[in-house]
């Protein structure tokens, strides 16, 4: 079976768009990781279209975050169900991606909701 537009021949990639032209110019399209802050409103049905990238042969991965510091990559436990619904809404309405990552480094304290960052020194 030939690879789909979501299955690159290469394992390398970049974090966030801006340098993908280097892979394309070399004839070696790889992965492109997007990071999205979605919040946890279960009624929000907004989405993104990643087909401008996937249609060029780039494989798109999207990390779904509740937010960034101090909101937390995932919300407080009381909002888990709302965040799950928001993620489901986003995935169902978005195009050009089939690899989804929920949250980022949840074992890293600064990624938790309400985390306080201590300055070193």
Give short role names for the model-derived ranges.
Residues 30-35, 51-54, 82:
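Short, low-complexity, polar/charged sequence segments that are solvent-exposed and flexible
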Residues 16-22, 41-51, 83-89:
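Alpha-helical scaffolding within the catalytic cores
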Residues 1-40:
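Boundary/entry segment of secreted carbohydrate-active catalytic domains
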Residues 13-17, 33-35, 61-65, 100-103:
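A cross-family glycoside hydrolase active-site/sugar-binding cleft signature
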Residues 43-45, 70-121:
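Active-site cleft segment of glycoside hydrolase catalytic domains centered on the general acid/base Glu
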Residues 7-10, 28-30, 56-60, 95-100:
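Short, well-ordered coil/turn segments that N-cap beta-strands
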Residues 49-51, 55-77, 102-103:
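Structural motif corresponding to the early beta-alpha repeats
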